[in-house]
């Protein structure tokens, strides 16, 4: 199984991680759809629609399908596009409509099949003890009839789970999960910052450890780990709020809550030194006390 990527507009740290994993770089979007049966979109949520449009445009180029037929041994013209980003079900249906509108002259069959998806859990970690990988769960939904013979292998390799036939279901599951993890982290930042401002953070941490240790561990670990990812979570919080209102029928209450959480992460990413943190190169916010003090100071300076 060949793994390929497009190096356009990626940061140096991301490129270093990709190259370390021996993933092959391709020069253009067209090369990607010519040489790939499956295209997996994993980008910041704000870039999800733009990425889908890039693939759409590449598939519409007049020589894409003929070159793909020459490259692929099967000669199959169809590309399978998975959006695995933390975006609202409404946006997934919009992307599905986009690909459904794709029309290629003299091509009777659909040239692309879209599947909704989401990644639940952290990045893969290799366990030296049992020599197995701990992998995140990749949930997908949408029509799966007629998928190629290589699809079961992809499911097994990536720990994919089909959760339903409808576009949007996988995203709803992903966002419902994230609301309880990243949402809790945003709430923890509000709590820890307030306690720090009043000089009672040590007492708060002590009481969490004594009376609700599991909550305390989740809250402190989340607060420490979030800094390098806060910029990605801004749109994810908004997507959660939208999903709660549109799919959960909360009538605006979901957006009221999670738009506020989005603002928490925006402040972290854009108004504090925590926004400069990089995964694997942490300098600040490695302890919850430092996170709370940085945010408390930033809030004082805003008023």
Residues covered by each model-derived region:
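Eukaryotic N-terminal low-complexity, Ser/Thr- and Lys/Arg-rich leader segments
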Residues: 1-3, 20, 57-77, 101-110, ...
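NAD(P)+-binding Rossmann beta1-loop-alpha1 motif at the extreme N-terminus of oxidoreductases
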Residues: 1-41, 61-75
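Conserved beta-strand segments of alpha/beta enzyme cores
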Residues: 4, 24, 80, 113, ...
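Short catalytic-loop micro-motif centered on adjacent basic/acidic residues
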Residues: 41, 81-84, 116
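Beta-loop-alpha module in the N-terminal Rossmann-like domain of NAD(P)-dependent dehydrogenases
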Residues: 43-55, 91-92
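Short glycine-/small-residue-rich Rossmann-like dinucleotide-binding loops
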Residues: 43-44, 86, 240
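Rossmann-fold dinucleotide-binding core
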Residues: 87-182
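Helical "substrate-binding/catalytic lid" subdomain
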Residues: 170-284
């Amino acid at each position: 199984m060949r793994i390929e990527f497009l190096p356009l507009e990626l940061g140096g740290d991301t490129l270093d991680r990709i190259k370390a994993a021996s993933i092959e770089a391709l020069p253009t979007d067209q090369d990607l759809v010519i040489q790939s049966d499956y295209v997996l979109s994993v980008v910041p949520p704000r870039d999800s629609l733009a990425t889908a449009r890039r693939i759409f445009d590449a598939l519409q180029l007049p020589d894409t399908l003929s070159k793909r037929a020459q490259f692929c041994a099967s000669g199959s013209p169809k590309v399978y596009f998975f959006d695995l980003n933390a975006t609202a079900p409404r946006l997934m249906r919009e992307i599905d409509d986009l690909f459904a509108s794709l029309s290629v002259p003299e091509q009777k069959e659909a040239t692309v099949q879209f599947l909704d998806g989401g990644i639940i859990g952290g990045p893969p970690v290799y366990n030296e003890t049992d020599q197995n990988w701990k992998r995140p769960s990749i949930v997908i939904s949408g029509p799966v009839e007629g998928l190629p013979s290589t699809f079961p292998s992809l499911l097994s390799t990536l720990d994919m789970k089909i959760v339903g036939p409808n576009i949007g279901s996988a995203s709803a599951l992903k966002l419902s999960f994230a609301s309880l993890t990243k949402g809790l982290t945003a709430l923890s930042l509000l709590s820890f910052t307030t306690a720090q401002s009043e000089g009672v953070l040590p007492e708060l941490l002590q009481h969490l450890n004594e009376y609700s240790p599991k909550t305390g561990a989740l809250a402190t670990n989340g607060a420490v780990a979030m800094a390098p990812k806060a910029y990605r979570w801004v749109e994810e919080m908004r997507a959660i709020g939208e999903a709660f209102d549109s799919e959960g029928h909360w009538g605006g209450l979901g957006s009221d809550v999670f738009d506020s959480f989005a603002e928490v992460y925006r402040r972290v990413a854009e108004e504090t030194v925590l926004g400069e943190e990089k995964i694997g190169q942490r300098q600040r916010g490695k302890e919850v006390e430092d996170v709370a003090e940085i945010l408390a100071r930033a809030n004082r300076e805003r008023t």
